[in-house]
Amino acid sequence: MNSSSSNEKNGKKISPVFIYSAIIAAIVVLIGAIFPTQFDSVTNEVKMWITDKLGWYYLILTTIIVFFCIFLIFSPIGKLKLGKPNDKPEFNTISWFAMLFSAGMGIGLVFYGAAEPMSHFASPPDADPKTTEAYTEALRSTFFHWGFHAWAVYGVVALALAYAQFRKGEPGLLSRTLRPILGDKVEGPIGTFIDVLSVFATLVGVAVSLGMGALQINGGLNYLFGVPNTTWVQAIIIVIVTILFIASAWSGLSKGIQYLSNLNIGLGALLMIITLIIGPTVLILNMMTSSTGSLLNTFLFNSFDTAALNGQKREWMSTWTLYYWGWWLSWSPFVGVFIARVSKGRSIREFISGVLLVPAIVSFIWFSVCLLYTSDAADE
């Protein structure tokens, strides 16, 4: 009996989605390794084409998703439970917040915590650089990028997966959420294509996050211990982080991932609180409040603003806003699967409210603390 027949008999048949995704990923990595300069040039050209030709679509899509989430919170649909009527949440609320926050943002908040608002302060889209107005503009822009749009995208994908999985008994595959539209075609080549596309998009999102994390860790090691800031060191860091992630995932949600998420959110909260106390506390709170008001006041305009006749701002949007919208969309299959898995037993209203509001508010506080503490230290 050959190995393929043996695997099928033992229920270990390798999924076509895995095979196709692995082949595509290997080809892309191989091309990038052999032709790094050309690969970088081509991917940049593709990015520029997407942001130039499809930027309007990204803005409309993500904004519709935000308002769809708001509709779900206040509609009767919100009463539906993600699971059977007697199902209870598997994780307590604090651990649930910790896990979805760690999966959704993680290293991004650390990497961009001070860097992004400081960049906007030095070169704001709608204010004079390094002025009082630039502070508010910097935080408003950062809140906009890391706030409701990002978490609405995550929330809708996670909700679709959770509903299909826990109420309809479907596997946790993105293709199966489209059964009401595609019918049984989701079990054929069309479904495989959708799942391969979502896996590849996830790989791209993971690559960005791992790359940023490696740069951040390498920078810290270089500053503290003089470890060389090189590609090889960053590759080793990525390997170590990947091994730790696999070990955590292997130990299960209720052990490794839950404990790591709680530790992650605990250390992050401790760092944020200490920084808030030793920094310009009142100024941080005042600026956070003002910038939140500015965000809400300009929310609709900025959600649809394509800067069609403003070349400088359009270039800024390509670098920041549209880049983020693409990043959140590419990351959403992975984050959505995880959030769906840990949210069984919660109502749709509770689910959307928690996913949309809590992480966004925490992000606002984090960025306010990072910007004002960093700029205050720089002034001194």
Regions found by a protein language model. Give the residues of each.
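N-terminal alpha-helical transmembrane segments of multi-pass membrane transport
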Residues: 2-134
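Hydrophobic alpha-helical transmembrane segments
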Residues: 62-63, 137-157, 307-331
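Helix-loop-helix module between adjacent transmembrane segments
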Residues: 11-12, 16-19, 24-33, 66-69, ...
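Conserved small/polar residues in nucleotide/adenosyl-binding loops
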Residues: 373-380
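Hydrophobic alpha-helical segments and their helix-loop junctions in multi-pass secondary transporters
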Residues: 27-39, 63-78, 207-220, 224, ...
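Juxtamembrane inter-helical linkers in multi-pass membrane proteins
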Residues: 125-133, 174-190, 291-307, 375
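Membrane-water interface regions at transmembrane-helix termini and the short interhelical loops
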Residues: 6-10, 35-50, 69-88, 140-145, ...
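Selective recognition of specific alpha-helical transmembrane segments in multi-pass small-molecule
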Residues: 22, 99-108, 198-209, 235-250, ...
